[in-house]
Amino acid sequence: NPIINKFAYGYSYVFRGTPLLVQIFIIYYGLGQVEYLRSTVLWVILKEPYWCAIIAFALNTGAYTSEILRSAFQTIKPGMIEAGKSLGISSKIIFYKIQIPIAIRQSLPAYGNEIILMLKGTSLASTVTLMDLTGVAKYIISTTFKPIEVFIVAGGIYLFMTFLVHNTIKYLERKFSY
């Protein structure tokens, strides 16, 4: 469908082409300026920094993930689909048993990078008064006046979480390898 394709392209282009921090600011500060939204049920969600950050992260990672999956599906050789059809396998079964497993395997390294980037991107949530790891670090610094020690610990925690994600993705890559 050309309309859906244009919408998907535009969504991906906008969210991959603008910084995550700008997206968080537009959702948290910008949408609150729209008078109509303040009188709808959406305001219950949009007035909270937690939900605004979640929405921004979801829209951002959704754009990158859609591009990762698009490129993964494009790596599937048409001959594999034709082989399934020649054996009398339905298109639905070909999709679930041939295309999806190949696309998952192809997309894992890039998707692992996206997860790590999103994990590190959570530090931007502190800019909208949300107490994430970076926000807590800033608070501790304001009471202890020891920025180096606090940021080294915060960086170590991020590094450990990245280590866990990286090793989980590597395990899945080995599990799904041929």
Where in the sequence are the language-model features?
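Transmembrane alpha-helices and adjacent helix-loop boundaries
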Residues: 1-178
